[in-house]
UniProtKB/Swiss-Prot annotation:
NCBIfam families: PRK05808.1, PRK07819.1
Enzyme class, UniProt record, top EC level: oxidoreductase
Protein name as catalogued: 3-hydroxybutyryl-CoA dehydrogenase
Alphabetized PROSITE patterns for the sequence: 3HCDH
Catalysis: reaction(s): (3S)-3-hydroxybutanoyl-CoA + NADP(+) = acetoacetyl-CoA + NADPH + H(+)
UniProt pathway: Lipid metabolism; butanoate metabolism
PANTHER family on file: 3-HYDROXYACYL-COA DEHYDROGENASE FAMILY PROTEIN (PTHR48075), 3-HYDROXYBUTYRYL-COA DEHYDROGENASE (PTHR48075:SF5)
Enzyme Commission number(s): 1.1.1.157
Length: 282
């Protein structure tokens, strides 16, 4: 594989684009508005500038990486790509439309991957005529730094597709794990209910935000407490994953806590909104 298209220029999409470009891949970064594309490219530029400042890369390397990334609002730019990674909003209807469009645009051998954190790869693949070439590639934030990629098979994903994506993940410095399709996959099925339980402990008045996080950092050796981590991920994303886990399994242990819903309804989404369980506006 030589050329990759990333659909969605938000934090995850931009990070994925940076990770590929840093390892020599030609990358197309696509979003629906020029302002979104420009914001994504600026995000990558700032990330690379920080690496230059820290002495981790040279200025010339930064320039080389940036020249490998082209931004666009034209989905047809994915036509000659070997791999397309969708990192759009976590809604099945939107993802299926994107994959249906890509199926018509891309060459027959192109692999179509989704960065979904919890949705069904099999259902996404049903929107295409190439379900054998549809797969999940779940990156973690920040994508240029985090080593893990969950590689998720849909019911029709071929071994050839899986092997190609695994090899490509290793080529960009990641350490992939193979995951059978299931709600939340591995990490989020364990992690998000833990965050939800921490919300419940807070709501019941058992401990404060700070003490809940301190307890898990000192008692379980977690680098970040569950409520701080929820703010980092985005409380809206945490809620969306809990909703998928609950609706898919019907298990009450995955029911999102009322307080989590209230925060999301209030627009208190964590770091990205300036307020979540902590105040980031200062």
């Amino acid at each position: 594989m030589k050329k990759v298209c990333v659909i969605g220029a938000g934090t995850m999409g931009s990070g994925i684009a940076q990770a590929f470009a840093a390892k020599g891949f030609e990358v197309v970064l696509r979003d629906i508005k020029d302002e979104f594309v420009d914001r994504g490219l600026d995000f990558i530029n700032k990330n690379l500038s920080k690496l230059v400042k820290k002495g981790k890369i040279e200025e010339a390397t930064k320039v080389e990486i940036l020249t490998r990334i082209s931004g666009t609002v034209d989905l047809n730019m994915a036509a000659d790509c070997d791999l397309v990674i969708e990192a759009a909003v976590e809604r099945m209807d939107i993802k299926k439309q994107i994959f249906a469009d890509l199926d018509n645009i891309c060459k027959p051998e192109t692999i179509l991957a989704s960065n979904t954190s919890s949705l069904s790869i099999t259902e996404v693949a049903s929107a295409t005529k190439r379900p054998d070439k549809v797969i999940g590639m779940h990156f973690f934030n920040p994508a240029p730094v985090m080593k893990l990629v969950e590689v998720i098979r849909g019911i029709a994903t071929s071994q050839e597709t899986f092997d190609a994506v695994k090899e490509t993940s290793i080529a960009i410095g990641k350490d992939p794990v193979e995951v059978a399709e299931a709600p939340g996959f591995v990490v989020n099925r364990i992690l998000i209910p833990m965050i939800n339980e921490a919300v419940g402990i807070l709501a019941e008045g058992i401990a404060s935000v700070e003490d809940i996080d301190k307890a898990m950092k000192l008692g379980a050796n977690h680098p970040m407490g569950p409520l701080e981590l929820g703010d980092f991920i985005g409380l809206d994303i945490c809620l969306a994953i809990m909703d998928v886990l609950y609706s898919e399994t019907g298990d009450s242990k995955y029911r999102p806590h009322t307080l989590l819903k209230k925060y999301v309804r209030a627009g208190w989404l964590g770091r990205k909104s300036g307020k979540g369980f902590y105040d980031y506006s200062k």
